[in-house]
Amino acid sequence: AHCRFITKDWLQKLDELNLSPNGIYCCGCEPFNDKMDFSYLVKAKGLGARFNRDNKLTILNPKWNPSSSVDATKIFDTEIILGANYISSKKWWDKIGGHHGFRRNLREEAFLSIKTRMAGGLVQCIPFIITAHKFRKKPPFTTSPINAAYNELAIIYICANDLFPEYVKLEKEYRGNDIVNEVLLQMDSNMYELETERQRIKKIAIKSFEESLYI
């Protein structure tokens, strides 16, 4: 209900691209305002995303690629897919485990992109297929720092288990002991799923977590 394709023949164009099934792809995104009308499109445009390298923790919370930084006429590699408008083949989705091990929809762009690159797949943006996206000032659901911390630590547990103690410490410094201790209890109760996903990525990975952060 909050997205519209601006590119009217998007499905035909997508089919003609003959994309590799071993990857995950996003398209361009233009936000539009409260009038829900394409004639009111604002100027900002996102074409894929990149890791926020301010520090080790924010790296899991991506930033948009500004349209001025890329060639919008051809498909290009991007560090992270842009949320709300990405696709993959079902075979690839199942291979990397999709959203298994995650809570709701926080940090999933980084999660899927990291796992894809670790497994040797493509992470790309198709900039000439555009969706318009209604970005709300406030989401219609309750967000929780526990869910964000859970997903950030789940990424590390599954994709970079040796760094898990370090990231627990970083989360405690950022969010406080009470929140992170609750997250650790919840992770412990979900350990079968988390460990299953960790073993999945360990089996298919040809790159390390650190290598997956760079194109």
PLM features per residue range, with description:
Residues 3-55:
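Conserved donor NDP-sugar-binding/catalytic core segment of glycosyltransferases
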Residues 80-82, 90, 94-125, 129-131:
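Donor nucleotide-sugar recognition loop
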Residues 126-142:
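Active-site donor/metal-binding and catalytic loop motifs
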Residues 82-83, 144-215:
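Terminal low-complexity segments of carbohydrate-biosynthetic enzymes
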